Amino acid sequence: MGNYKSRPTQTCTDEWKKKVSESYVITIERLEDDLQIKEKELTELRNIFGSDEAFSKVNLNYRTENGLSLLHLCCICGGKKSHIRTLMLKGLRPSRLTRNGFTALHLAVYKDNAELITSLLHSGADIQQVGYGGLTALHIATIAGHLEAADVLLQHGANVNIQDAVFFTPLHIAAYYGHEQVTRLLLKFGADVNVSGEVGDRPLHLASAKGFLNIAKLLMEEGSKADVNAQDNEDHVPLHFCSRFGHHDIVKYLLQSDLEVQPHVVNIYGDTPLHLACYNGKFEVAKEIIQISGTESLTKENIFSETAFHSACTYGKSIDLVKFLLDQNVININHQGRDGHTGLHSACYHGHIRLVQFLLDNGADMNLVACDPSRSSGEKDEQTCLMWAYEKGHDAIVTLLKHYKRPQDELPCNEYSQPGGDGSYVSVPSPLGKIKSMTKEKADILLLRAGLPSHFHLQLSEIEFHEIIGSGSFGKVYKGRCRNKIVAIKRYRANTYCSKSDVDMFCREVSILCQLNHPCVIQFVGACLNDPSQFAIVTQYISGGSLFSLLHEQKRILDLQSKLIIAVDVAKGMEYLHNLTQPIIHRDLNSHNILLYEDGHAVVADFGESRFLQSLDEDNMTKQPGNLRWMAPEVFTQCTRYTIKADVFSYALCLWEILTGEIPFAHLKPAAAAADMAYHHIRPPIGYSIPKPISSLLIRGWNACPEGRPEFSEVVMKLEECLCNIELMSPASSNSSGSLSPSSSSDCLVNRGGPGRSHVAALRSRFELEYALNARSYAALSQSAGQYSSQGLSLEEMKRSLQYTPIDKYGYVSDPMSSMHFHSCRNSSSFEDSS
């Protein structure tokens, strides 16, 4: 039994074939080198071979730097058969080799000049003479795929089964390079289809490995009949090779019943063709083998204690393949090989975190242990999959296993309660994980320095730091000055935590920011990249602060027009991000990351959690990005694959927050709020005061199904319509936090610097707003019920007469409607009272 951890990724046959391939590449390079003649010399030679008079005066002892005689040059520079005869009659030997190891016949064949080939052969050239690499002229014709040259040689008696230095016949070479017509010609002249190469490989092995179906069929014809079960020196049959390299059409052809292929045969490593298909992620091939040949191969273990299921977990990049194998109900997800390791061990050892998550979610037991077969029988070294991941430095997987909550557990595990018993002794980063992280970070920084335009490169000495205006896990944010601009400086700490480092976040954020240019997205000024201790990101300074601060710390009240301006700006910024050539998903859109200008316009900021959409599959998605309170359900629950529609959900919550002035689910902690939205389909209440067009937009925006959410282009269009028609909205359209009706201006505030410049500056106090709204409401009640005098009431009288919406302990006005249940996407527009 072999040790799984020492399983080679390449076999001896692979190494040999790599050298064979390299040798033929070198052969072609040497042939091409012989054909390279200086321009001046080439012109002179063409004149010699183009004129009988000039040819008669030529020096017969002439040689080039590469040792080419006139006989060689005649084959390269347009000579004629008469020149060949004359030169050979005057004593030039056709057997003479160039410094690269080729005769004139070799060069004539490589040039595919049938006339000169015939002339050389008629004049006495040896058709079997070997040159560099033990190659004959027929080998060279086959390498180049020259059908006419090969035909001439075979007509003149070339040995069709002669072997070169690596024991390849011309048929081997034709099968390797896929020269179908040459293969047909060689078979016509009696080429042996079952002759062995240096490592026992037949032409059918080579055609199967390279995927040449038509050549495989030619080799299997009645007149040829290659042995379909022939084994090389490592007991590979042709089916092993086409399965390994994913040549589905050849697999299907070989598995035909009349060919009598043995589909479950094993090589010296114990691998069936199904093993090799799974080790290389060839899903369609694996399906074909099982559907045609049955499930016998699924139960076979190789010498490394791996079934085909283990092999698929070792490959780890095709969850569909793993799922298909499990669906056959032959191998259990917790099947242990002879050494005790499971598919989960294999996935952990090779760092396939998505597969690890899938296996855990489907019942894989992380407590099962494997033994090291290299130890003596008296020693016991049992290891869980966590230890295998730790050994290889896959710290993200270690963290996942330590904290994974199994369905039967009430609480997730932690490092002191890890079921396998070794969690409390394992801390991350692991030694190897730390080295990997440091190496990757250095590579990332070097790539970032090389790729960042020079005008974005900043020195720390160029930056003047003023007061601190914010902080986070990454470090601190300062107000400052750089290149005569007031800027915000995000200063990173150069420390590493687990596999998620500040350096990693820094590189990602800079690589994204440097590509952004939009008025509704924070403007990038530059970055300091020289030393991890000096890492900093510099952006424009937005003086109005964050939307969160404005609404919930300063408790400022905006009118509806100001709210819509902010909402439109944010939507435009997000639309820009999602429609880039390389779309960007923000992943952390919330009111903290929406910054306001003094004129009331907004920009989207903070791209520390952002990703290029195409890179999501490569990222570790076990950590939920961003703030839980604004997180889309699919991000909170799955923590795996999601789309740009996750940003739309977060935006819908921000829009509700802008309109109501309240924190979403303020009475809950962030995790509880996210859980309520994800598992109970709860959404913030939509009061009667929110305009209907916006209400419908909110309902669609926080749809439980991502596909049911609108694109940001539609959001922008709808909100701009509301902004343009704002005066048509009734006074009741003001929100539950009591915003005043907009001013009389009906202009659409699309461009910065329009009529809305003073809106933020003209904010009212909450008391003034409540007074105005309730006075308006009281007037309406008086007119309809006749209960009050027309002379007006004092504020105290109005307070007693009207029922105020209660104000909670945080100072926020509670919406008169209770929280609502939001149903699944099949009925996305319906609500029901939570009571």
Swiss-Prot record:
Enzyme Commission number: 2.7.11.1
Swiss-Prot/TrEMBL ANK repeat ranges: 66-96, 100-129, 133-162, 166-195, 199-228, 234-263, 269-298, 304-335, 339-368, 381-410
Low complexity: compositionally biased ranges: 732-746
Keywords noted in UniProt: ANK repeat, ATP-binding, Cardiomyopathy, Coiled coil, Cytoplasm, Disease variant, Kinase, Magnesium, Metal-binding, Nucleotide-binding, Nucleus, Phosphoprotein, Repeat, Serine/threonine-protein kinase, Transferase
Residues that coordinate or bind ATP: I469, G470, S471, G472, S473, F474, G475, K476, V477, K490
Effect of P742L: In CCDD; uncertain significance; decreased autophosphorylation
Residue ranges, annotated region (Disordered): 732-751
Protein name: Serine/threonine-protein kinase TNNI3K
Species per Swiss-Prot/TrEMBL record: Homo sapiens (Human)
Name of the encoding gene: TNNI3K
